[in-house]
Every structure is written in C-alpha cells, then in structure tokens.
Regions:
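Active-site mouth loops of central-metabolism enzymes
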Residues: 22-36, 88-98, 146-151
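Active-site-adjacent beta->alpha loops and helix N-cap segments on the catalytic face
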Residues: 4-18, 32-34, 59-76, 94-99, ...
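Conserved small/polar residues in nucleotide/adenosyl-binding loops
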Residues: 191-194
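Hydrophobic faces of well-ordered beta-strands that scaffold small-molecule active sites
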Residues: 2, 21-25, 52-54, 85-89, ...
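Catalytic cores of alpha/beta
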Residues: 34-40, 98-103, 150-163
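Glycine/small-residue-rich loop that forms an oxyanion/phosphate-binding "nest" at active or ligand-binding sites
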Residues: 30-42, 50-62
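Glycine-rich phosphate-binding active-site loops on the catalytic face of alpha/beta enzymes
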Residues: 50-60, 113-121, 160-181
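Conserved, mostly hydrophobic/aromatic
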Residues: 10, 44, 87, 114, ...
Length: 194
C-alpha cells in the first residue's frame, strides 16, 4: 500500500506480477466528503490501484447517519469499478453496536472487506474480531484484521481462529516463523487438503 501519489510508480514497478497495488482513500479519519472520496477512488484506479483501503467517517457513524454512510459506501464501490474494496472502521473508537452497524453497512453496500483498523491506533480486541466475523458470516464481505498488537504471533493466529479471513501486518515473517510453535500448543490446527 502507498499513498495515491506513489500509485502510478508502484503499479509500473509491479506490472506483470500478481502483487496487488494498494491505494489509501480518505486517510486517516475518513472525514472527506463522499464526492472527494469517490474522486480519490476513481483517480487511484486510473493510476493503477488494484485494491483500495477507505477509511469510514467514524463521526458520521457515531451520529447514526446510516443512510448517508451507506450512500457513501455505495458510491465508493461504484467508483472502484470492480477493483477490490476495503472499508476501515477503526474499531478502537466504536461500541459493539457501532461495530455491528458498520459491518452491516459494508455488507449492504457490497464492500469486499471490512477492516478493523488502520494499524495506527489501538488494535482490535478478540471480542471485536469475533463480533465482526459473526456479522459478516454467510455474506460476501470478509474480515481483515490490522493493528495486531504484541504478542503478534499468538494474537494473529487467534484472530484467524476467531473468524478473520486476513491479517494485515508488517510482522509477517515473525508470525509465519511461529507457526510450528502455535500448532504445538493447539492455536493452529494441522492443515489437511480437502
């Protein structure tokens, strides 16, 4: 992921690979207008982004302006033109009811992923990840957890067991290297192919 400024350069460097080109929309607090976010989304796609992270307007959610948020989310999906969409809801600032409402709005708008955090603030609790996973179960919206705090390997694997589909982290080698230990203590199950 990069800021949109770097998207064309990253897209050019990654041309011919299967690595996704990520661009950030509405960072860090999602307080831009819907029109600005839609334009930013269209620009990122035009410049070569293949996956987008958008920040939800937490203030609007806390004000219960659900129709406005849902409309903004739909405009984001439309502006993405089929590119993978994620919505960061920043769970550290939300109540359980607000987390549920945010997930439901993402599902209704057709957003591909609901993401717990930017990773810049407090990460999610286990209970928050379970709540997100329960809300999204049986839908086309998947759960990504970012902002995994220490102990990262244990927390990352527990979040996956709790229903997260993806972990966003800068500590992937540390987490992967701990797989055998996590399996040994029962956090990770042995993988068997279907």
């Amino acid at each position: 992921f990069s800021s949109s400024y770097w998207t064309p350069i990253v897209a050019e460097e990654l041309k011919g690979t299967d690595i996704l080109v990520g661009a950030a929309i509405g960072f860090p607090f999602g307080q831009q207008t819907s029109a600005v976010k839609a334009f930013e989304t269209e620009e990122a796609v035009r410049m070569g982004a293949t996956v987008l992270d958008n920040c939800m307007n937490v203030g609007a959610l806390k004000d219960k302006r659900y129709d406005e948020i849902k409309q903004e989310f739909k405009e984001y999906v439309e502006a993405a033109q089929g590119v993978m969409t994620k919505m960061i809801i920043e769970v550290c600032y939300l109540t359980d009811d607000e987390i549920k409402a945010a997930c439901e709005l993402c599902i209704e708008a057709g957003i591909d992923w609901v993401k717990s955090s930017t990773g810049q603030y407090a990460g999610p609790t286990l209970e928050q990840v379970i709540l997100m996973a329960d809300c999204c179960k049986g839908t086309n919206t998947r759960v990504k957890v970012s902002g995994v705090k220490d102990p990262r390997p244990q927390n990352a694997y527990v979040f996956l067991r709790a229903g997260a589909d993806l972990i966003g982290t800068r500590q992937a080698p540390q987490i992967i290297d701990s797989f055998d230990t996590m399996r040994k203590i029962g956090i990770c199950l042995l993988y068997t192919s279907p």
